[in-house]
């Protein structure tokens, strides 16, 4: 070889893409004349320009040359020509990890650089044969090949043979002129290589396991391996199936031997083994097997079938779509496929199947840490999982009736969907291109360090954005980002061009999901593109059914009506309906939502600009769909006042109005309708309806909390009742022909109204009191007060208007229903002093000023109510028994006929009544000494009781949780059903329970989960109530709670469920599984 030293110029080094010029000169200087000639150095300099990272490629190459020189290996034999050199340098520039492996493994250099290695041209059978021979097994044995080498030698040979083929695949990939085009081929070859490695590992496991000849063992690949779209570095999802190889094997022996084989197989693939220098291949994940990681490692075929028939959740059938026998007994593998396919292709008919899968997908997105959301190539929005999800949902929905769609590979399936008319050709091409591009990016990131990753390079502050908002990009900073520069060079792009292409791809994938899944649900006249496909009637019905529509024919008619014509509303609907259908499908009742959407257009579409507003405000449109598909009450309310829709675009408009703002509105009504009771009543009741609508919309949208919604509703009642009393007083002053009122009149709020806990369906409990003016006689004052109250009640609940009544409940007044509606202050004083019962003292705990004469209210509360409700003397045993008996009698008498005790949110066992009476009893016992307890609200009093150590923290938490849940459930029940008379009753049907559950933070169709959770909380509350209110010992209360729970729990009618320790961690298992 030539002896002169090769000395490239700075310009030569820059043209080659090298950045550290001093280091590059030093490295070229290390290439001694007897190692590589000047001509070869020139070739090297020329091929470095093709490397993703020329600096790293040069450094690794020099290390490899030095290692070969030290071991006296012939460099020209390993790298015989310029083509081999370019191949090697391209690999070294793309994979720093493989370069480090190659320093001490010349066979990897040969595999990557020399075409004669030919391992990248292996087919599946040849790969299997090569790795089986490496472990000393017979490749011609298709069912049960057994290794002949000991564990350490076989594992070393298997791992080394795997990496030799992996190096050749990497070389094939990075040398491709168009890596995006050949991406499916690369994933297929990686999958074939993994299949072969698993076959080899199973052969080793047979060698290491006594009795293996009695066990038929097959490996089912799931996820990317099953779909033959494996990455370079990825967990491998597997399921193991065993059957006896002969009749003499009992089940226990079969499972024991099979488990040993499965454990050894996994150890060979993923664990450090003594005497084995080669690194493990990849991690094996068995989480997709029945019962997940808590289930048996191996099962017989019938056990798999039994699980899928009885216990599998919806997402597990989606996962089965990717199942494929990858190694082991081929006949048993086929038997598994024959067993599982019917489950896969009937899955879309399972209840809430698509909804559950969508929620799983959404949960995955939500679990991504905020700094990584826009870097996640796989799991992020617009990433690989979005493409896979779109394709899988279409397959599962339409594959039930169209067998041509029954494939597992994403791109093959996308092509079949296009050929079948479910996806347009143009959409299929775009989605396929996007998927391949993101896959190549993911592969390039993994190749570099041969570690599992699917993150786009860290761009610092520019890492956030790219979808809804632009990234904060500095081009100079991007050019300094070595990781980004390396990845961009793999595509022949500048760094900023790669960032733009990545973001464009994500946006297109997100858009294509809507276009592909939802736009074809619109009729042909509503399509936006020339090549848009038109679904058959059957396919359209299947798609509407899949997203939760109970009456797909009606839904199709609604969509046709909404998109027909050339009007502005129809044009806007054609644009936004695909997204609207998706959002409605996420609700409990999509049919109701779409019907309400159509009603809005029929009522206001030609006169209001609300559709244009929704087109321009995605958040408002999504909120509206959530409301229309989950609330009958608010759907009806919006159809009466479409201007409320504009509130949904601004959280400020959804905030509850202050008392001052409410008083301004009532004051205006007083001035405008001072002489017309019908119009004034209409304005007050409409105001209440309007504010319920505002607060309901705000509560459903998560803008205000549960407690804020109760306080806001109380303010609305106070403002309306105060204004109504003012109107009535003014009207009667005129009617009596006097200048001033003969009596002052006040409204004392009682019950939940007094506690500022008004819900959407509440009455207003109150006591009305008057006191004669200084110059008025009692008779005139009494007559005046009666007339005022008559007007007040007419305004609030009389037949003066079609607006819903505001019930003013006066049953808590002295003498109850037998007493006068309005009573003088003196009469109240005499009554409470002489005749007040214990329960009336308790009821006064809620008393507060609401409207009217504030001084009169203050005198009543301080002089009459306070001594009774905050007594200094302890309650006697007789008084305690009286309260307890009264509570029991009230619940028995007021509980509606036919309603079970545990189903009533207010009067039922563990319901609101239990919490409130328990707290109020303790107020009666301690508020005389503790001034902080002199509050009207339940939770405020409970907080004080806990702070003063009068109740344990555990009991306080239980009472607080129950009260909050039951109150929210009442509100949710009312908004869901629109029926005030049913708001206190927990429905029996799971569907209606699901509608209520949405308001408590559950997803749609989670009625059973909500019911179980709520009833469990109420049972625990009842236990606390038994101890604190009824005075039972802890043992007595526990026994009573156990009896209640047993009575409320239906007996199983089917085979026993799997072990409870398996069921308990299922939610956590689902979360882990969703992240893959």
Curated annotation (Swiss-Prot):
Segments of skewed composition (Low complexity): 1041-1056
Record-level GO BP terms: regulation of glutamine family amino acid metabolic process
Record's keyword annotation contains Nucleotidyltransferase: yes
Documented EC number(s): 2.7.7.89, 2.7.7.42
Keyword hit for Transferase: yes
Region span, Disordered: 1041-1076
InterPro entries: GlnE (IPR023057), GlnE_rpt_dom (IPR005190), NT_sf (IPR043519), PII_UdlTrfase/GS_AdlTrfase (IPR013546)
Reactions that this protein is recorded to catalyse: [glutamine synthetase]-O(4)-(5'-adenylyl)-L-tyrosine + phosphate = [glutamine synthetase]-L-tyrosine + ADP; [glutamine synthetase]-L-tyrosine + ATP = [glutamine synthetase]-O(4)-(5'-adenylyl)-L-tyrosine + diphosphate
Cofactors that this protein relies on: Mg(2+)
Region (Adenylyl removase) location: 1-521
Gene Ontology MF: a single term: [glutamate-ammonia-ligase] adenylyltransferase activity
Pfam short name (any one): GlnD_UR_UTase
Family statement: Belongs to the GlnE family.
Protein name: Bifunctional glutamine synthetase adenylyltransferase/adenylyl-removing enzyme
Phylogenetic placement of the source organism: Bacteria, Bacillati, Actinomycetota, Actinomycetes, Bifidobacteriales
